[in-house]
Amino acid sequence: MLGQYGRFRKQVPLATLDAWIGQLEGWREIDTTCQSNFTAKEVLAAWDAWQLFLVDLSQRETIQHRRASLVLLVKPVRDSDDDRLISTALANVERLKHEGDKLITKAISWVLREAIKRHRDAVAAYVAEHESTLPAIAVREFYKKYRTGKK
């Protein structure tokens, strides 16, 4: 529904989105709600609020909020070269990289891979510097996409 009604999506307060995220179960519901629904243009238009929201999500006790802190950035980092987006994405990765739950490790891999399109040098430098502390699957999938262009 969020994807089909952009005009209404822009009117959804972040507090409402936060409440919705808190009701989600599993990766499919989180990803359907958070990935590709919010564009870089929309996020950047209200950057101060979004940046605080994304950082806050990454520090929550609930795993669905922590996953959302990464998944909400997948489309924006893929579609915009704005440094604020990749900086926030990498800061959230840094906060969450020690978690072993697949919901987080796969989200880390996803946001790193999608960032290659617009932030190739920055994300490659980050992965090279933090390779030993990032989830192994994220490093493996990142380098495959980086080298071949394919997942």
Question: How should each PLM-predicted stretch be described?
Answer:
Residues 1-151:
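Alpha-helical scaffold domains
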